[in-house]
Amino acid sequence: MTVPINASTSQDVEAPPRPKDVGILAIEMYFPKRCISEEELEAFDSVSKGKYTIGLGQKFMACCDDREDINTFALTAMTSLIEKYNVDPKSIGRIDVGTETIIDKSKSTKTHLMDYFAEAGNTDVEGVDSKNACYGSTAALFNAVNWIESSSWDGRNAIVVGGDIAIYAEGSGRPTGGAGAVAMLIGPNAPLVLEPIHGTHMANTYDFYKPKLDSEYPEVDGQLSITTYISAIDASYAAYRAKHAKAKKAAGLGGPAFSLADVDYPVFHSPYGKMVQKAHARLVYNDFLANPDAPRYAQVPERAAWLAQPYKASLTDKTLEKTFMGVAKAQFDGTVEKGMRCARRCGNMYTASLYGGLASLLASVEPAEIRGKRISMFAFGSGLASSFFTIKVKGDTTEVQEKLDLIRRLESMDVVPCQAYVDSLALREKNHNAGSYVPEGSIDNIWPGGYYLESIDSKYRRKYIRAPKA
């Protein structure tokens, strides 16, 4: 016998009013207390002067030992965000984490963050981790924004955390390491509003990957990683421009196609500084191909040759690259460089790199100047996943700039000898995957109020402690 269900006996629950201007309400950066000089690393590695500082465009690189892991990074970044902005833990309904620093094949970093909310009586928090190289934080951000804009939204805000420890085996990749984390408060009526169009490109590549679960070090195809990044920015930018044109047509709007002329401040994922210069120059090249007769390209040399260049050849043509880096230099120095503070000081932060760029921009440009401006964001993760999207600064960023206090904090990092970095990596190698141990790194290297790993027991359960605040 079946019993009919009378729908009228259920109470219909209406969704809350649709939110407007969903985006980033607040942002916080975390980075280790120590860094090394890339100039000193050149001498330490006995390589030619300028190989890292000019060739890679790097200045410093953050480092940490076995007292820190992705969970301590995430805990410190998130807790600092909550405390600086007096966020009620019960006002958070979702947490999304992006990272590629995997220390457990099952248990997410997000679960470690839940202790903070459980103490406040809030365990109703959606979201888990997203993983794909450096792209996970952007997937996390899109997930959080989409949740707030969906019918599932319960009226609360979200938090997005992204962070990584970027380290490499001895060799050419090691100078492109770094470390850091970002935490962002996501909600409606935000000063930094995510605009609705995303241009995305995804593919299956083996430019950078981590198949060795007994090691933190990646497998890297250096040349392929460069062409993969460049082809990804081409494809995601093209997808964005196509969607933008379609949206304009549907709205009955005319005018020229979208280009960098519509962007006030471009921000890029930064594996290393020179790659950002190449990426920006590549967007300028794409705009040139789309509108070669624009007055701003009148002085481009060998115009006919670049217009006739086969696409595949363009990916590795050093003359083309150098030409458009020259064309783009003034714009790079005046706009893109303002988003490079974290990258210059901390190096590659993987999932936090793009948002470290955003934080750097907000720290570098006065709130009155940046208000009303558009920021483009290029997210990239090897393997590969990439997106081009935009943020409109609709509100006042004064509070964000003041509470970030980014410039002073970056300058207060301890610059340590290169041998200290090598020793830190040796310590991490020695204790990677270890159980029943107490980390050997000094807690003097932890910022006041930062979390650190106290111990791992015989069942590989990690215990974290927070350092006293200053």
UniProtKB/Swiss-Prot annotation:
GO biological process, any: ergosterol biosynthetic process
CDD domains, alphabetized: init_cond_enzymes
Signal peptide: none
Binding residues for (3S)-3-hydroxy-3-methylglutaryl-CoA: C134, T176, S225, H269, K278, N348, S382
Pfam family, one: HMG_CoA_synt_N
Entry annotation: catalytic residues: E100, C134, H269
Catalytic function, reaction form: acetoacetyl-CoA + acetyl-CoA + H2O = (3S)-3-hydroxy-3-methylglutaryl-CoA + CoA + H(+)
Induction of synthesis: Expression is up-regulated by salicylic acid, abscisic acid and methyl jasmonate.
InterPro entries, per database record: HMG_CoA_synt_C_dom (IPR013746), HMG_CoA_synth_N (IPR013528), HMG_CoA_synthase_euk (IPR010122), Thiolase-like (IPR016039)
Key word Transferase present: yes
EC number(s) recorded for this UniProt protein: 2.3.3.10
Top-level taxon in the UniProt lineage: Eukaryota
Biological role stated in the UniProt entry: Hydroxymethylglutaryl-CoA synthase; part of the first module of ergosterol biosynthesis pathway that includes the early steps of the pathway, conserved across all eukaryotes, and which results in the formation of mevalonate from acetyl-coenzyme A (acetyl-CoA). This module also plays a key role in the biosynthesis of triterpenes such as ganoderic acids (GA), a group of highly oxygenated lanostane-type triterpenoids which are well recognized as a main group of unique bioactive compounds in the medicinal mushroom Ganoderma lucidum.
Family according to the record: Belongs to the thiolase-like superfamily. HMG-CoA synthase family.
Protein name: Hydroxymethylglutaryl-CoA synthase
